[in-house]
Amino acid sequence: MNNPNQPVSYPIFTVRWLAIHAIGIPAVFFIGSITAMQFIQR
């Protein structure tokens, strides 16, 4: 896991994981809020 020969793989993986989590959590919250509003309106 600690390979100095591939310093490019570590930052890319970190950025990708961070982006997925940063986008996934608010997306789930947004979708849940929309569904809740639709159910309340109905």
UniProtKB/Swiss-Prot annotation:
Q: Keywords in UniProt for this one?
A: Cyanelle, Electron transport, Heme, Iron, Membrane, Metal-binding, Photosynthesis, Photosystem II, Plastid, Thylakoid, Transmembrane, Transmembrane helix, Transport
User: Molecular function terms in GO for this entry?
Assistant: electron transfer activity; heme binding; iron ion binding
The source's domain of life comes to: Eukaryota
Localization, UniProt? Plastid, Cyanelle thylakoid membrane
Q: Provide the binding site for heme.
A: H21
Name a GO CC annotation attached to this entry. Answer: photosystem II reaction center
**Matches recorded under InterPro entries:** PSII_cyt_b559_bsu (IPR006241), PSII_cyt_b559_CS (IPR006216), PSII_cyt_b559_N (IPR013081)
Which residue ranges run through the membrane?
17-33
The Swiss-Prot or TrEMBL record lists the needed cofactor(s) as: heme b
- Which GO biological process entries does UniProt record here? photosynthetic electron transport chain
Q: What is its main location?
A: plastid
The UniProt entry lists membrane topology as: Single-pass membrane protein
Say yes or no: keyword Disulfide bond present.
no
What detail does the entry give on cofactor binding?
With its partner (PsbE) binds heme. PSII binds additional chlorophylls, carotenoids and specific lipids.
On subunit structure and binding partners, the annotation says: Heterodimer of an alpha subunit and a beta subunit. PSII is composed of 1 copy each of membrane proteins PsbA, PsbB, PsbC, PsbD, PsbE, PsbF, PsbH, PsbI, PsbJ, PsbK, PsbL, PsbM, PsbT, PsbX, PsbY, PsbZ, Psb30/Ycf12, at least 3 peripheral proteins of the oxygen-evolving complex and a large number of cofactors. It forms dimeric complexes.
Q: Which NCBIfam families match?
A: cyt_b559_beta
Write out the function statement from the record.
This b-type cytochrome is tightly associated with the reaction center of photosystem II (PSII). PSII is a light-driven water:plastoquinone oxidoreductase that uses light energy to abstract electrons from H(2)O, generating O(2) and a proton gradient subsequently used for ATP formation. It consists of a core antenna complex that captures photons, and an electron transfer chain that converts photonic excitation into a charge separation.
Give the protein family.
Answer: Belongs to the PsbE/PsbF family.
Q: What is this protein called?
A: Cytochrome b559 subunit beta
